[in-house]
């Protein structure tokens, strides 16, 4: 395994250099500041004052978490239900927040500009998101948006789509981070090509999720990847129940569902559930000190 890990490290070092040369740099201190600004903006008071704003439709389902934490698997399970549609990684939430940022450009940035949103604008943005998913799946009762990084936007999502459901996928931090490190995301996830950067991103993800879980009122279900692998039917029933859908056996045969999957896990979700990816990090343990030390208490 030493040889294969060395090859991964060389590839990641080269990729990081290439990204940095084109100005795509992950700066942990900037990321930490951005997460703190989200928490400061979407305070308990902010959310309380805007209760009942936005569009209350129960159609949107956001599956989010760290990349490579089981988001594609959970989406595929839900998409196997006859009344649900898997839309993949939609950019609509970031499109709406960028539009908000553009509106106040030069005066106030996102997320701080969210405090200027009126009740009518929140309803309008919620409707804009619904229009986008209705176009994709007019008949579906639930539409899954599995953009992992939406975990950063949960305060915004609650403000404009308070009736939506959030499924937060969790996976062992070492496996989750190593799986990112072993994946070439092409032009995204700039934090994933360096073990120290990955650890920094992961720590901030945990900090923000802990905050959302105690502050938000939107419905959130946490799904642990390893538990889903070990108790497939039990956890799948929990997911379908959370979505307020009737049970359907097709959700257990998710790997037979014919649909386009355009993410890094496309091949895995065509196989029945297995334990191959559980504790995979242990094979590479001797070379993961930077990651383990960076994760600290989370490792």
What are these language model-derived features?
Residues 50-161, 169:
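Phosphate-binding active sites in nucleotide-utilizing proteins
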Residues 175:
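Glycine/alanine-rich phosphate-binding loops at beta-alpha junctions
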Residues 17, 80, 99, 163, ...:
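A short linear boundary/processing microfeature
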Residues 68, 147, 202, 229-230:
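Short alpha-helix boundary/capping motifs
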Residues 1-60, 110-141, 180-222, 230-299:
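PAPS-dependent sulfotransferases, especially Golgi type II membrane carbohydrate sulfotransferases
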Residues 90-92, 150, 172, 226, ...:
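Short, solvent-exposed coil/turn elements at secondary-structure transition points
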Residues 70-85, 153-165, 169-172, 181, ...:
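PAPS/PAP-binding and catalytic site of the sulfotransferase fold
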């Amino acid at each position: 395994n030493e040889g294969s890990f060395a090859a991964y490290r060389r590839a990641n070092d080269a990729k990081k250099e290439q990204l940095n040369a084109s100005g795509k740099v992950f700066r942990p201190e900037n990321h930490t500041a951005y997460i703190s600004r989200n928490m400061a903006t979407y305070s308990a008071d902010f959310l309380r004052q805007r209760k009942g704003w936005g569009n209350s439709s129960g159609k949107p389902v956001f599956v989010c978490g760290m990349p490579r934490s089981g988001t594609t698997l959970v989406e595929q399970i839900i998409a196997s239900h006859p009344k649900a549609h898997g839309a993949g990684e939609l950019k609509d939430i970031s499109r709406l927040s960028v539009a908000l940022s553009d509106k106040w450009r030069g005066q106030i940035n996102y997320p701080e500009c969210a405090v200027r949103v009126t009740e009518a604008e929140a309803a309008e943005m919620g409707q804009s998101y619904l229009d986008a998913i209705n176009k994709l799946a007019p008949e579906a009762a639930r539409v899954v948006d599995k953009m992992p990084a939406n975990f950063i936007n949960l305060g915004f999502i609650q403000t404009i789509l308070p009736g939506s459901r959030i499924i937060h996928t969790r996976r062992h931090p070492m496996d989750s981070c190593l799986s990112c490190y072993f994946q070439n995301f092409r032009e995204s996830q700039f934090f994933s090509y360096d073990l120290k950067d990955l650890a920094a991103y992961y720590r901030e993800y945990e900090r923000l999720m802990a905050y959302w879980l105690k502050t938000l009122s939107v419905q959130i279900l946490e799904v642990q990847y390893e538990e889903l692998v070990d108790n497939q039917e039990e956890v799948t029933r929990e997911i379908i129940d959370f979505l307020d859908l009737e049970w359907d056996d097709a959700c257990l045969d998710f790997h037979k569902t014919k649909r386009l999957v355009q993410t890094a896990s496309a091949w895995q979700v065509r196989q029945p559930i297995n334990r191959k990816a559980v504790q995979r990090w242990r094979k590479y343990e001797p070379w993961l000190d930077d990651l383990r030390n960076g994760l600290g208490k989370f490792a």
